[in-house]
Amino acid sequence: MQKTELDDQKLVEEIARRIREILELLGENPEREGLKETPERVAKALLEMTSGLRTPPPQIKVFSLGEDGEAYEKNQIVLIKDVNFSSLCEHHMLPIIGKIHVAYIVSNSGKVAGFSKIIRIVNYYSSRLQIQERLVEQIADAIMNSEIKPKGVMVIGNAIHMCSYVRGVKDKEAKLVSVAYRGLFKTNRALQNHVFRLLDNANKVNLL
């Protein structure tokens, strides 16, 4: 069903009404100066940060490296690094903020993905209540099953979780690293290590 502006406005109104109730339960006055527009702002922010639940997944635009696929049988790796992402932890609805690195092995047909499309896939699966371990798996599956038909996909996530930063243990330094492997990356440790070396070398020359 096609989404309309009327649908969006109704969602904002319904969510804002419940945010007002939450503010009251917390002991706040949602009518005081400074909070009058907060429920609507929060509603719009939540809808934006969970937009992936209500929109279709982005399609990967395919480009060809050439007509002779034989040139790509040596497992050429494409690495898209430092894709900034933010999501909402599904346990506490607090932000997860970090970076995603995506590597894939070009198929023998020489098909590669449009650069921005990989970023859109990261944004799409980040825009929902999420856990980081699932996020990297979903990104890996989306690319592995796309029209570029890569021989393998490797997705690395590195992020700070506000649920442990501002509450609970309140650790300001801890980061979570999660990795998903598909195809050749799943069984070939040399290929895995090659990607880690690429990231490490980029860091050494101040490219990270």
UniProtKB/Swiss-Prot annotation:
Zn(2+) binds at residues 89, 92, 163. Keywords: GTP-binding, Hydrolase, Metal-binding, Nucleotide-binding, One-carbon metabolism, Zinc. Its EC number is 3.5.4.16. Pathway: Cofactor biosynthesis; 7,8-dihydroneopterin triphosphate biosynthesis; 7,8-dihydroneopterin triphosphate from GTP: step 1/1. The keyword Transmembrane helix does not apply. GO terms for molecular function: GTP binding; GTP cyclohydrolase I activity; zinc ion binding. GO terms for biological process: one-carbon metabolic process; tetrahydrobiopterin biosynthetic process; tetrahydrofolate biosynthetic process. One of its GO terms (cellular component) is cytoplasm. The keyword GTP-binding applies. It comes from the Archaea. Pfam families: GTP_cyclohydroI. It catalyses: GTP + H2O = 7,8-dihydroneopterin 3'-triphosphate + formate + H(+). Homomer. PANTHER family: GTP CYCLOHYDROLASE 1, GTP CYCLOHYDROLASE I. Belongs to the GTP cyclohydrolase I family. This is GTP cyclohydrolase 1.
